Amino acid sequence: MNGALGLIETFGLISLIGAMDAMLKAANVEPAGPIVKLDGGVVSAMVRGDVSSVRAAVEAGAEAAARIGELRAAHVIPRPGAAIVRAFGADASSGGGAK
């Protein structure tokens, strides 16, 4: 993957939906795989795009998640290795967003 992968993890689906909405509106990114449901109400999602867009999106998503509910973690991986992308089911068909 030439671009970046942005990850966000929240407690509760509503916080994650708010975070994803903010991320997709804030920058030229697109979802990269399904929402992952973990134990205890923890959920996570990924976006992909160019590095600067993913950084801006994750920052906006983290702020939204914290405002709505509980942000657990947020992280950007520039140029993730192919094994990481495959392991987590991220769609890596392009490095940029599709807006």
Language model features with spans:
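Long, contiguous binding/interaction regions
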Residues: 1-41, 46-99
